[in-house]
Structure formats: structure tokens, C-alpha cells
């Protein structure tokens, strides 16, 4: 998300925070951590160059540096990793800091579209010079862990560190995070697998959230689904949703979403759409609605519409 992993040598180790985002009672910083191998006087043994004259000049310069700074000891960087450092003025309980840490990982899970789980968590208490490790006891399904460990390609991410204002995004996210707990959980605990029951639940949840989004937009009751869809779904994503219902009836997309949601939620409704749709249809409809709700969030975080549409087109299943 931050930099292509295969090109990590392009980055210098920084002793200063790489970025800082700050609110009224919190501060979030991204910091480097690196490990080094001692190389000492053997540095010249691991350096090579096709230009022999340049290589010889390097050797001579290195010897001159050694003479000028006899106490200098060289080392080679082995690894470079990134950590978030979180501070809060008002939070005094460990659980509150853990919750804020999960908010950070939750946002990253949404932006990357895969579970992002805290690997290490340390606390530094006021007045202490030492860090204290925190052992997390949260349980995850093996499928979730496998997805979290799955490699991603920085260059193929439609939203990454370099093409958004990450400070602004974090500042807005900490204001909004509590309102999107149910959405965040679907990303953090994603398994990549759906039962029929889970597919039904996704449709009910995200259709209901579209209703709430419609209210924030000032939409009427008759447009409680179609108004958010028209606002946040790309033309391609909307077309994908429409394809499920065109083969069944001539009703509008909004009317069909309303009918399907009610058929799933109410036992007394006639199950016309439910009888016509397959489990694969249910899964995709639920995921498309989830992406539209996510796009509403991304828009509120200040991310440009063109990047949101690229995000939709990449994460939406065919």
C-alpha cells in the first residue's frame, strides 16, 4: 500500500516520522523500523560495478573515509518495515487504544480490499522508557488469515498511499469510524467464501444501509435505493446490478432491490425474486451493494470520484 515491496531499496530509512495526522485528542504517525547487518571494513567486498574506473574510485574514496573517520562502522540494511504510532490525550484505558488501533487497520482493510490485521502491538506507558507488548486474543477463521497474508501488488491498487491525501483521509476516518463498524467488520473478517445464509444477510444489511445513505442525501422514500446507487455506483457497476433483474421482470433497479430486500427480511412476502435467483446471484448482488456503501464512505473521506470508480471496477466480481 505504501511502496512496491519488490522495490523497497528505493526508500531510505527515516528516523523521523514519515507522516503525521493529528486530531483534537489524538496523533497518528507512520514510522520506520529497520534491521541491519554489520559489515564494517568488508563493505567493499559486496559492491560491484561494470565500470571498473568508477569502482576503483569508490574503493579509494572508501579508504579515505576510513582514514578520516576511524571510528565509523558501516552496516547494511536488511529489512525495512512500517509501523503506526498512536497517541491520545484523553484515552487512558488499554482497550480504548486497541479499539483505535483496530480503526486504523479497518481503514486499511477497506482501502486495500482485504483483511489487514495488527501483527504486533506495543504500549509505552507515560513515564516509562520501555515498550510493553500486548498479546491479542482475537480469533480469526483460517480463511481470513490466508487472505490477510495474501500478497498484493502496489502498482495494481486503485487507491494507494501516493494517490490520496492520506492525512486528510485519516483525520476524517477517526470522526466517522464508529458509524461504519458493521461495514468495517465485513472487510476485517472477510473469508472469501459465502454460504447462502451469509449472502442473504449481506443483501439485507447493505440495502438497509443504502436507505440510511438516502436519508443523508435528502432523498425521498421512493428513491431510497436508486438515489444512492445513481450517486455512488459507476455505470459499469450499475449495469452489473441491472443484469440480474432484466431477465426476470421489467421493474426498475430500485424497485427490484426493494422487493428482494423485503422478500428476504419478511416471512409473509411472496418469494418471486428469491425463486428466480441463484446463490451466485445473491453473493454478487450483496457484494455490489457493499461496494456502493463503501464508495459512499470513500467519498466522505475526500477520495476523488475517478479513483473510487477504478476501485469499484477492480474489486467488483464479474
Tell me what each language-model feature is:
Residues 1-104, 311:
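Long, contiguous, compositionally biased segments that the model treats as domain-scale units
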Residues 3, 16, 69, 114-117, ...:
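Intrinsic-disorder/low-complexity coil detector
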Residues 6, 12, 21-23, 53, ...:
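A generic structural signal for short, non-catalytic loop/turn and secondary-structure boundary residues
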Residues 13, 17, 22-26, 116-134, ...:
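Short, charged N-terminal helix-start/capping segments
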Residues 14, 24, 44, 61, ...:
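Generic serine detector
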Residues 75-147:
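Basic/polar, acidic-poor N-terminal "presequence/leader" segments
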Residues 133-318:
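Amphipathic, oligomerization/interface secondary-structure segments
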Amino acid at each position: 500500500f505504501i511502496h512496491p515491496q519488490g522495490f523497497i531499496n528505493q526508500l531510505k530509512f527515516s528516523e523521523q516520522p514519515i507522516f503525521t495526522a493529528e486530531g483534537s485528542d489524538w496523533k497518528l504517525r507512520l514510522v520506520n523500523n529497520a534491521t541491519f547487518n554489520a559489515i564494517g571494513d568488508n563493505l567493499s567486498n559486496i559492491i560491484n560495478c561494470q565500470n571498473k574506473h568508477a569502482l576503483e574510485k569508490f574503493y579509494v574514496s572508501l579508504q579515505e573515509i576510513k582514514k578520516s573517520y576511524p571510528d565509523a562502522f558501516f552496516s547494511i540494511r536488511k529489512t525495512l518495515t512500517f509501523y503506526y504510532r498512536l497517541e491520545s490525550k484523553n484515552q487512558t484505558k488499554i482497550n480504548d487504544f486497541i479499539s483505535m488501533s483496530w480503526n486504523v487497520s479497518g481503514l486499511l482493510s477497506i482501502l486495500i480490499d482485504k483483511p489487514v490485521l495488527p501483527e504486533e502491538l506495543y504500549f509505552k506507558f507515560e513515564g516509562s522508557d520501555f515498550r510493553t507488548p500486548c498479546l491479542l486474543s482475537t480469533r480469526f477463521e483460517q480463511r481470513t488469515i490466508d487472505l490477510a497474508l495474501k500478497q498484493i501488488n502496489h502498482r495494481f491498487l486503485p487507491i494507494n498511499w501516493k494517490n490520496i491525501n492520506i492525512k486528510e483521509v485519516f483525520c476524517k476516518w477517526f470522526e466517522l469510524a464508529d458509524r461504519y463498524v458493521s461495514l468495517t467488520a465485513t472487510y476485517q473478517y472477510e473469508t472469501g467464501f459465502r454460504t447462502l445464509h451469509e449472502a442473504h444477510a449481506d443483501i439485507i444489511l447493505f440495502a438497509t444501509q443504502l436507505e440510511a445513505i438516502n436519508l443523508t442525501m435528502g432523498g425521498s422514500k421512493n428513491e431510497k435505493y436508486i438515489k444512492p446507487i445513481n450517486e455512488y455506483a459507476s455505470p459499469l457497476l450499475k449495469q452489473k446490478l441491472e443484469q440480474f433483474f432484466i431477465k426476470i421482470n421489467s421493474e426498475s433497479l430500485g424497485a427490484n432491490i426493494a422487493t428482494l430486500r423485503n422478500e428476504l427480511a419478511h416471512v409473509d412476502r411472496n418469494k418471486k425474486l428469491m425463486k428466480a435467483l441463484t446463490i451466485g446471484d445473491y453473493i454478487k448482488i450483496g457484494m455490489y451493494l457493499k461496494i456502493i456503501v463503501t464508495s459512499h464512505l470513500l467519498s466522505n473521506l475526500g477520495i476523488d470520484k475517478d479513483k473510487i470508480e477504478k476501485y469499484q471496477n477492480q474489486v467488483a466480481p464479474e
